[in-house]
Every structure is written in C-alpha cells, then in structure tokens.
Amino acid sequence: MPTREIRHPLIRHKIGLMRRADISTKNFRELAQEVGALLTYEATNDLPLESYEIEGWAGAVQVEKIAGKKITVVPILRAGIGMLDGVLSLIPGAKVSAVGVARNEETLEAHTYLEKLAPEIDSRLALIIDPMLATGGSMVATIDLLKKAGCKDIRAMVLVAAPEGIKAVEQAHPDVTIFTASIDQRLNEHGYIIPGLGDAGDKIFGTKQKDA
C-alpha cells in the first residue's frame, strides 16, 4: 500500500516548529503528541460505522459508533511513547501493546528486546507509532512480530520518514500503509534523517543535548 504524507496545514506548521535546534523538551513532547493525534485522525478515517439509537434531550435519536473494531496502539520503545497520549486522546478505549526495539549504532541493525502485546491482538487493528522512520529496521521488526502474533490489519504512523526507511518497509511489508507528517530527504552516514528532527527519543525524554 502507498505511503501517505499528510500535508495538512496544521501538521506542516507543527512539524516545522519541531525542527528548531533550540526547541525545549516540553515543547517537543507536546508537539509530538499533537501531531500523533492528527495522524490518528487520518489513519482511522476508513473505520466502519454502525447506527444505534439513544435517548437524546428531545427523545430518541439515531447516532453512529465505530462498528466493533478493536484497536491496539503499538509504541516502539522508547521514542514511540512520546506520541502515545496524543493517539489515545482520540481512541481512549484502545489497548496498548509495547514493543522494545534497539538499534545497533554501528551496524544500524534492529533487535527486539521486549514485547507485551494486547489480548486478542490477532483480531485488532494495530497502529504502530514511532516518531522516526529512518532505516526501517525497527518498523520491519515490529511488523514481523505483529504478523507472527496473527495481526492482519497493521498501519504505521511516524512523524518523519526517510525514503530509505519507506523503501525497506514497503519491500518487506507491502500491505502496511505508512502515515507520515513528512517525507524527508535522506539518511546521513550515521543513520539519522536529514533534515529530520534530531534524536526524537532524547528530545522527548530530555536525556541529551538538543542538537544530538
């Protein structure tokens, strides 16, 4: 499925603010949550609806609800946690499945060190969240894990994506749609996205200098 770059004015504005070298941890964290919520709006726009009747202020009224689609949000630790509250603000009933994937900074290869999946995950829509899609290794490893657990409907939401990461995911899992706020230029020799956001995990958690 094609990657979708969501070019909504609010998203473009907020991503622009996130690129500032001098952004504070507080502002970066808040913006990550806000853009995460806006991407959720796009990633769930095809969920089926069903009608039902409630008692309104003037009597019975027909309203709609999402038709029995169970959802799990899958943050890739640790940076994915920075988008989680924004996503859950729109789908508060979703279960959270945590997946820990670490990248070897020399080889840039990913390995999974933690998986805590929601019950009945094989019948759920899985929304993977991770601020950066760089080499694609962490995303591919997470999708591999979810498919092994029986997931059939998987979508990925990232703040910024590199063409190299998109290509890796599309080659390994062409059935998974990627929703991103920005497709950036390239990866540098260290596997960082250019122009990118810097190290999103460090900026969300305030663990290193802002220009890391």
Swiss-Prot record:
Chain sites annotated for binding uracil: I193, G198, D199, A200
Free-text remark on how the cofactor is bound: Binds 1 Mg(2+) ion per subunit. The magnesium is bound as Mg-PRPP.
GO annotation terms (biological process): UMP salvage; uracil salvage
Keyword Transferase in annotation: yes
Alphabetical UniProt keywords: Allosteric enzyme, Glycosyltransferase, GTP-binding, Magnesium, Nucleotide-binding, Transferase
Single GO term (MF): uracil phosphoribosyltransferase activity
Domain of life: Bacteria
Cofactors required: Mg(2+)
Catalytic function, reaction form: UMP + diphosphate = 5-phospho-alpha-D-ribose 1-diphosphate + uracil
This protein's pathway: Pyrimidine metabolism; UMP biosynthesis via salvage pathway; UMP from uracil: step 1/1
Chain sites annotated for binding 5-phospho-alpha-D-ribose 1-diphosphate: R78, R103, D130, P131, M132, L133, A134, T135, G136, G137, S138, D199
UniProt cross-references to InterPro entries, sorted A to Z: PRibTrfase_dom (IPR000836), PRTase-like (IPR029057), Upp_B (IPR034332), UPRTase/APRTase (IPR050054), Ura_phspho_trans (IPR005765)
Enzyme category, top tier: transferase
EC assignment: 2.4.2.9
Activity regulation annotation text: Allosterically activated by GTP.
Record function comment: Catalyzes the conversion of uracil and 5-phospho-alpha-D-ribose 1-diphosphate (PRPP) to UMP and diphosphate.
Family: Belongs to the UPRTase family.
HAMAP family from the UniProt entry: Upp_B (MF_01218_B)
Record-given protein name: Uracil phosphoribosyltransferase
Protein's organism: Ectopseudomonas mendocina (strain ymp) (Pseudomonas mendocina)
